[in-house]
């Protein structure tokens, strides 16, 4: 291995996960501990949770962290599913101070997309590709010929009279007691809207529900235009951790 493993940390609306990553192969080389996202998810409380996970993994000389919001030059510009006090926060500075090593910060869906385009379902694909992460909310990452268009936040588009993630996120299926088929149709309609906007050749569906893609794939296939391929994420919900580590290693 030409480079030491790098710690990637994926901060979500409900949980924070971390692992050591072999960034040459895109593989986790440690356990993947998880802690509940503190509520309220303020910067200091989240940073403390991240530090607990990093300490448990033995630390690293450089660490990558994702956050669910728009990130520009290390500063959080919007806050989705975390406390509003993140807005305007120098997240790079916060995590670097808390952990005592250099840290990089990237939008969570962008991180997952980078990992899938490098090691997973999008590997070697040109044209327009979209990664959609379905969890507490909906995250997105858009790529053109393999190049990331950062901070798209397509889960915040208006869809059927409300914010899209309030209609079709994975958390909505549980909260509204939807069957997989009912929820799959919602996702299919949402993805169809994205095909109208971007005409992607590929849509990668990520998040924990990617493990159960076959439960709602037929509903998606019945709605999304045939010229757009829709596939589950190969890295499943490991993608955010791997992408965070890639960025920390300077490879994006």
Residue ranges and their predicted role:
Residues 138:
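Extracytoplasmic strand-loop-helix segments at the start of, or within, the mature domains
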Residues 1-62, 71-75, 95-103, 115-130, ...:
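ATP-binding/phosphotransfer module of carbohydrate and carboxylate kinases, centering on a glycine-rich
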């Amino acid at each position: 291995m030409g480079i030491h493993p790098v710690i990637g940390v994926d901060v979500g609306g409900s949980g924070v996960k971390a692992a050591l990553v072999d960034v040459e192969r895109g593989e986790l080389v440690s356990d993947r501990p998880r802690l509940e996202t503190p509520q309220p998810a303020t910067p200091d409380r989240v940073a403390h949770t991240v530090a607990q996970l990093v300490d448990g993994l033995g630390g690293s000389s450089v660490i990558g962290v994702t956050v669910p919001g728009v990130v520009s030059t290390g500063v959080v510009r919007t806050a989705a599913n975390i406390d509003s006090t993140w807005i305007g926060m120098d997240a790079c500075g916060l995590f670097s101070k808390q952990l005592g090593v250099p840290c990089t910060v990237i939008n969570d869906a962008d991180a997952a997309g980078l990992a899938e385009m490098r090691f997973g379902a999008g590997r070697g694909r040109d044209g327009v590709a979209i990664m959609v992460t379905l969890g507490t909310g909906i995250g997105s990452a858009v790529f053109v010929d393999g190049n990331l268009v950062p901070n798209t936040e397509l889960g915040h588009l208006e869809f059927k009279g409300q914010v899209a993630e309030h209609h079709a996120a994975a958390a909505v299926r549980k909260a509204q007691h939807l069957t997989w088929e009912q929820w799959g149709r919602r996702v299919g309609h949402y993805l169809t809207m994205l095909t109208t906007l971007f005409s992607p050749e590929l849509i990668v569906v990520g998040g924990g529900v990617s493990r159960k893609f076959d439960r709602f794939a037929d509903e998606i296939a019945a709605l999304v235009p045939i010229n757009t391929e829709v596939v589950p994420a190969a890295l499943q919900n490991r993608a955010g951790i791997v992408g965070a580590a890639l960025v920390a290693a300077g490879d994006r």
